[in-house]
Amino acid sequence: MAKENYVYVIGQLRKEAFVVKNKDTGRPTEGAMFLTTIRRGLYDAAGNFSPRWDKPLIRTKDPRLAKKMLEFEVNDIIEAKCCIVTHHVKKIVKCPHCETKQARESSLVYLTPVSLTLRNRPEGETAATSILMDPDVAEMSNIAHVIGRVCNEEGVKYTNDNAGHTKANYQIAVNRKFMVYGSTMDRLSTNEETQEDRADYPWVVSYGKVADDDKKQLVQGSLLYIDGYVHTQTYKQKTICDNEDCQMEFDYPCQAMQLTPYSNEYLEGCNLVESVRNLNDRVSDETMELDGE
């Protein structure tokens, strides 16, 4: 399968990075931080100024990049070249009624950086926000180029609220293009917790015309190229307390990171509509004629 798992972000650091250090040497070993990014297209369909923000988690086990995180200051504007990574984890939650701690299965989705660069060090939060709202910066503040294959059994889940708002959800399998430091692809790694597959499984959420096209063309096994951005959101998840003496329902906070396409290219195993088939045939014929000259 073709490989493309590339995410590029320019974002504002609004809170100091969390960096873990070796107890014996004091040297950084891993780090994490949130960057506030802005989506391209600062105006809505009515022409009103309407910036939209996302806050992806950046996480690394590369000591070199963890050390860089220590050097960053609040409000710094940082460039990060990354790939999207997914892990199954156990999230510890606490019942607000009986205060019992308990584990819940969860999916951790984050960006692991290949490079981190300080772009600007503005004077204060207002100046930092102004930099991000520069149209030239917003155009490239949150870019995701990913090739993946639809892997969930039910394929595309499509919803329409009958008010013109359509949405499609599906999961894709993405082969890693970059080496994730500390993974099985990193031959220097000996940490058992990092033994992982060479693919990641993010969810995709598309809207409007893209969602309509996804519904028509995608099935389980379809291969597509996504030109879009990483979309983050927070939500509440309901659960029942494990404590037999309690068993009360409660909510706990969750964070999600998904891919949202500006456009999709349907590559393989898709239900291509007739117009696309005709275009492919025409391109193929023209190529054959050129080859024959």
Regions found by a protein language model. Give the residues of each.
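Flexible glycine-rich surface loops and low-complexity tracts that mediate binding to linear polymers
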Residues: 75-90, 222-235
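Short, contiguous, well-structured surface segments enriched in hydrophobic/aromatic residues
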Residues: 39, 173-176
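Short, structured motif recognition centered on aromatic/hydrophobic residues
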Residues: 34-36, 78-80, 144-147, 169-172, ...
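The Walker A/P-loop phosphate-binding site
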Residues: 199
